[in-house]
Amino acid sequence: NICIVFAQLERETIQKRVTDAYYSRSQRGFKMGGKAPYGFHTEPIKMDGINTKKLVVNPDEAANIRLMFEMYAQPTTSYGDITRHFAEQGILFHGKELIRPTLAQMLRNPVYVQADLDVYEFFKSQGAVLVNDAADFTGMNGCYLYQGRDVKPSKKNDLKDQMLVLAPHEGIVPSDIWLTCRKKLMNNMKIQSARKATHTWLAGKIKCGNCGYALMS
């Protein structure tokens, strides 16, 4: 049916326009909706003649963010150490106790970093697409990280082809501390991957004839 074909083409055209508009706005540093990350609130601003919102640092929450990163930057500090600390202090994040998946997500988020040339070089070395010039990374602003058009969902933790854009808001965490945390996260992921690689598909299925215990790796 020709009507169905035209309807499908129209849907695809609209979808492409929406996608193009999204990437165009994201490349210019617009906040792309959603709740403000912990440590910030939003205020309305106008960028390039378009009404949008800007993240503004919340001083009390920013202090918790800095402490979180300072703690994790220590070689022996774990997720559990940090979540327990904030739970014992009665500090909530968006009204909830801090849990490990949320903590990991926050530690990876470049929205908090005071992005300088070291941050630029790090993301460049990881294969990210950097929208701004190196000279723009002055150690003042945070960043937005957007999933590139060709990035597969399974590779979302990989920075290759993801798009990094300087944001108009001020960063919270010094670049050296943020980078220490990010590299620690990357090393932990490598260790976990190596452990998974040592396990065979026969684990738990074959048992020792003498002791009866199952094969674990």
Predicted regions and their residues:
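Conserved catalytic breakage-reunion loop centered on the nucleophilic residue
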Residues: 4-217
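Glycine-rich, charge-decorated loop segments at or immediately adjacent to ligand/cofactor-binding or catalytic sites
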Residues: 1
